[in-house]
Each structure stands twice: as C-alpha cells, then as structure tokens.
Amino acid sequence: MVLLPLKKDLVPFLEPYLPDEERDADKEKPYVILTYAQSLDSRIAKIKGTRTFISHEETKTMTHYLRYKFDAIMLGCGTVMIDDPGLNCKWWPEDEKPEHLAGISPRPIILDPNCKWKFADSKMKKLYEAGDGKAPIIVVKELPSEPEEGVDYLVMRTNFTGKMDWSDMLVQLKSKFNVKSVMVEGGGIVINDLLQRPNLVDALIITLGATFLGSEGVEVSPLVEIKLKDVSWWTGDLDTVLCSRLVTH
C-alpha cells in the first residue's frame, strides 16, 4: 500500500492529543487514545462480521502517522479475525527511512480472553517474520494449553461482574512490557466499553467518513451520555477528524 503524503496541517492539529514521555513518565498506566473511523450515522461496519472501509486515503495516512507515535496498538479478537490486519506502520519522516518496518511499528495487543485467534495463521506473523511488524501481546483469561511461539501473554484479571479489569490490564502492560502508549482501534464492543471509562482514556480521535451505512450497521453508541472537552476539528477533502478528551466524573 502506497500512502499519500501526510497533510502538513494534521501534525500541529494532532500534537496536543499525542503521548509525551516526559509528561506521562510518572503515570501508572500507559497513555491511551481511542481512535476509529465511523460513518455519519455512527456505524463502524455496514454489517456485523464484515470489513467496511469508511475513511479515505488522506486519513489512512494519518492512521499510520499515529502508529508511528505509539508503542502499541490494541484490537479485540473479533475484529482481528474478520480483518486479518497487519497493524504495522508504513509512515516515517522523509529523512528517516527504516531498513525494516518493525523498528517503527507499534506492538499489537490482541484482546482474546478465550484464545480464539491464532497468530500462526495471520498476516501479522508474516510481517513479523519479514521484519516488517512486531509479534503481539495477547490478553487472555488463562494461558492456553499450547502457547504460540513468539507471542507474549498477559493474563487479565476480572472484576466482580466477570468482565476484564481494564485498569489492571493497562497497568500490567506498562509494568511488564514497558508499553508507555496505546492506541485502541476497536472493535465495537471495545470502543463502547472504553467510552464509558473516561478515567482510562486520555484522548479521542475519530475520523468521520462522508457516508451513511444504514440501520443494520454496527453502531458505536455508549449506554450513557458522554461529554467531551478540548474539542478540535480538522476537515479534509472527504473526511473530518474530531480530537477531544472525555469529561471525567
């Protein structure tokens, strides 16, 4: 995939919402942004279980610029099993062309409580073996009986409802794997869950594609009202980008 040049005005626009090692050094958890593309009717996919392209070329370049800026990129296993993404980075500064993309790529973190996804069969592994991507950290309820080679596992704690303890998982990522910043890309369940945890999300970067996907699409809509602050908008040729922070209670 050949990327379009990064729009120059995106760099200062995004800067206030990106990680800063000095500012974030004393924090127990990594710096976390929630970033995804949605349609005008708040859908992230046209039909459940299918891959849908919403953003356009200029904001695809922005996505890879963000990947260049973060230590790790997080997705739920459902999205990974549908899309089979590489999750590497294909953007770099003009004067810093890397020999291999692994050196500039974020580390994938896959939320896979029940060990459904297989690294061995994935595009991620092909990129890893070619030196163009990193091997993942897989977040599980318990270690699999046959751990996959090259993979690191993080055994998550659950809260009183049996759901993943987000706070503990993020703290473990920083303390055990030195992950200082994470961009969370999806899917729908993960996005909706984190939107309701403003104390864990440091910034929100949403790409709005110029399309409606219809009522059968996968909707992003938290159960409760969520208010935003520090809101900024960027408008491109076909997409608009919203950057903000979540109001904490």
Curated annotation (Swiss-Prot):
GO terms for molecular function: 5-amino-6-(5-phosphoribosylamino)uracil reductase activity; NADP binding. Its EC number is 1.1.1.302. NADP(+) binds at T79, D83, M164, G187, G188, I189, V190, I191. Homodimer. It comes from the Eukaryota. Transmembrane segments: none annotated. Belongs to the HTP reductase family. The keyword NADP applies. Pfam families: RibD_C. The keyword tRNA-binding does not apply. InterPro entries: DHFR-like_dom_sf, RibD_C, RibDG_C, Riboflavin_Biosynth_HTPR. GO terms for biological process: riboflavin biosynthetic process. Catalyzes an early step in riboflavin biosynthesis, the NADPH-dependent reduction of the ribose side chain of 2,5-diamino-6-ribosylamino-4(3H)-pyrimidinone 5'-phosphate, yielding 2,5-diamino-6-ribitylamino-4(3H)-pyrimidinone 5'-phosphate. Keywords: NADP, Oxidoreductase, Riboflavin biosynthesis. It comes from Kluyveromyces marxianus (Yeast). This is 2,5-diamino-6-ribosylamino-4(3H)-pyrimidinone 5'-phosphate reductase. Pathway: Cofactor biosynthesis; riboflavin biosynthesis. It catalyses: 2,5-diamino-6-(1-D-ribitylamino)pyrimidin-4(3H)-one 5'-phosphate + NADP(+) = 2,5-diamino-6-(1-D-ribosylamino)pyrimidin-4(3H)-one 5'-phosphate + NADPH + H(+); 2,5-diamino-6-(1-D-ribitylamino)pyrimidin-4(3H)-one 5'-phosphate + NAD(+) = 2,5-diamino-6-(1-D-ribosylamino)pyrimidin-4(3H)-one 5'-phosphate + NADH + H(+).
